[in-house]
């Protein structure tokens, strides 16, 4: 019989959620520096805002946070959709950001030097 070895420790799940929670907490208080704690310095983001494609460096997100301020009523659900020893994908279901909009984000994370970081964010903004 082959060995059945658990390759992903529970602590990785906790660290991944904690990483994405930095993003959420930064949005709540309206501080891009707090949001940035979740992201790799070279991270990118792409998605549709009001029907127009927005894409490029994660600085676009930081600018949005700086321009629009706090999101005290933000509500989120975080789900790890996939995980390997060095990669993960997290879905962020979000309601009421700083401009009152709702989104679904998919964040791709990588574990480098023992630390989980978001390297890509793709999102869908809902109308209404």
Identify the role of each PLM range.
Residues 1-33, 37-41:
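Short, low-complexity N-terminal intrinsically disordered segments enriched in polar/charged residues
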Residues 2-4, 56, 117:
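Terminal "cap-and-tail" regions of soluble proteins that handle hydrophobic small molecules
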Residues 15, 44-49, 55-102:
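Surface-exposed, charged secondary-structure patches
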Residues 30, 97, 113:
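Residue-level signal for short amphipathic helical patches enriched in basic/charged
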Residues 39, 94-96, 122-123:
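Short beta-strand segments enriched in hydrophobic/aromatic residues
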Residues 102-128:
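Short beta-strand edge/turn micro-motifs at domain boundaries
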């Amino acid at each position: 019989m082959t060995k059945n070895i658990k390759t992903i420790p529970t602590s990785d799940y906790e660290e991944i959620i904690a990483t994405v929670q930095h993003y959420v907490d930064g949005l709540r208080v309206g501080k891009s520096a707090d949001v940035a704690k979740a992201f790799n310095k070279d991270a990118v983001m792409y998605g549709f805002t009001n029907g127009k494609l927005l894409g490029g460096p994660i600085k676009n997100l930081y600018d949005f946070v700086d321009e629009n301020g706090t999101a005290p009523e933000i509500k989120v659900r975080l789900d790890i959709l996939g995980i390997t020893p060095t990669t993960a994908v997290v879905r962020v279901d979000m309601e009421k950001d700083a401009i009152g909009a709702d989104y679904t984000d998919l964040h791709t994370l990588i574990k480098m030097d023992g630390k989980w970081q978001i390297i890509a964010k793709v999102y869908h903004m809902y109308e209404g």
